[in-house]
UniProtKB/Swiss-Prot annotation:
<dbReference type="InterPro" id="IPR036393">
    <property type="entry name" value="AceGlu_kinase-like_sf"/>
</dbReference>
<comment type="similarity">
    <text>Belongs to the UMP kinase family.</text>
</comment>
<feature type="region of interest" description="Involved in allosteric activation by GTP">
    <location>
        <begin position="23"/>
        <end position="28"/>
    </location>
</feature>
<protein>
    <recommendedName>
        <fullName>Uridylate kinase</fullName>
        <ecNumber>2.7.4.22</ecNumber>
    </recommendedName>
</protein>
<keyword id="KW-0665">Pyrimidine biosynthesis</keyword>
<keyword id="KW-0418">Kinase</keyword>
<dbReference type="GO" id="GO:0005524">
    <property type="term" value="F:ATP binding"/>
</dbReference>
<dbReference type="InterPro" id="IPR011817">
    <property type="entry name" value="Uridylate_kinase"/>
</dbReference>
<keyword id="KW-0021">Allosteric enzyme</keyword>
<dbReference type="Pfam" id="PF00696">
    <property type="entry name" value="AA_kinase"/>
</dbReference>
<dbReference type="InterPro" id="IPR015963">
    <property type="entry name" value="Uridylate_kinase_bac"/>
</dbReference>
<comment type="function">
    <text>Catalyzes the reversible phosphorylation of UMP to UDP.</text>
</comment>
<dbReference type="GO" id="GO:0006225">
    <property type="term" value="P:UDP biosynthetic process"/>
</dbReference>
<feature type="binding site">
    <location>
        <position position="171"/>
    </location>
    <ligand>
        <name>ATP</name>
    </ligand>
</feature>
<feature type="binding site">
    <location>
        <position position="62"/>
    </location>
    <ligand>
        <name>ATP</name>
    </ligand>
</feature>
<feature type="binding site">
    <location>
        <position position="57"/>
    </location>
    <ligand>
        <name>UMP</name>
    </ligand>
</feature>
<feature type="binding site">
    <location>
        <position position="174"/>
    </location>
    <ligand>
        <name>ATP</name>
    </ligand>
</feature>
């Protein structure tokens, strides 16, 4: 039961890593994880939240190894964009099976597969209650899906970018390696930069900072965490331009 009867946000951009879709597998998409995520998104829609989604592609394609072997970076990034489209198709299908209206929009034209991205159409769809999945990153090489999430969040005038990860917030050090690592509840953009805390790549992070777009990092693998974040309960780490109390 939530102690706060009203959601803390009205329109959000949810960023999911491709790796989150793998579950316990080492590659690809775990159907159980996909369906659970679709159900959690459905809960938000039923609360009246307008939901945009950006999914990474690391579960299907990682370009680093091929780049070291000599592959052109632009080619590798284009392959990565297509991986995000595949994940987007899977998420759209899972949402449809959960009886949630969803639209997949791609930053690169893929006629017959998904719609071309336009920000005016995306906002119109969100206002009508549809979940909008943004695929193919920004459509440009050398840009991460974190950058795409911040860019789309700013464009659709989301109130927050929710970054779903494998850990339940931002820590002073890697909690997997350092048991003494301390979790932060709130941080300012300046503190993250000063302490060199790993939240997302610098280009994405500074874009969010420059447009006063709050970032909330939480554990997407923790059942109910997404709903708690939306209801304004203590969950994850919020990063904003405001100084912590």
């Amino acid at each position: 039961m939530s102690t706060n009867p009203k959601p803390a946000f009205r329109r959000i951009l949810l960023k999911l890593s491709g790796e989150a879709l793998m579950g316990e597998e080492g590659f690809g998409i775990d159907p159980k994880v996909l369906d659970r995520m679709a159900q959690e998104v459905k809960e938000l829609v039923e609360l009246g939240i307008q939901v945009g989604v950006v999914i990474g592609g690391g579960n299907l394609f990682r370009g680093e190894g091929l780049a070291k072997a000599g592959m052109n970076r632009v080619v590798g990034d284009h392959m990565g964009m297509l991986a995000t489209v595949m994940n987007g198709l899977a998420m759209r299908d899972a949402l449809h099976r959960a009886y949630v209206n969803a639209r997949l929009m791609s930053a690169i034209p893929l006629k017959g597969v998904c719609d071309d991205y336009t920000w005016t159409e995306a906002i119109s769809l969100l206002k009508s209650g549809r979940v909008v999945i943004f695929a193919a990153g920004t459509g440009n090489p050398f840009c991460t899906t974190d950058s795409a999430a911040c860019l789309r969040g700013i464009e659709i005038e989301a109130e927050v970018v929710l970054k779903g990860t494998k850990v339940d917030g931002v820590y002073s050090a890697d909690p997997m390696k350092n048991p003494e690592a301390v979790k932060y509840d709130t941080l300012s953009f300046a503190e993250v930069l000063e302490s060199e805390l790993k939240v997302m790549d610098l280009a994405a992070f500074t874009m969010a900072r420059d447009h006063n777009m709050p970032i909330l990092v939480f554990n997407m693998n923790k059942p109910g965490a997404l709903r708690r974040v939306i209801m304004g309960e203590k969950e994850g780490t919020i990063i904003s331009s405001k100084q912590p109390a």
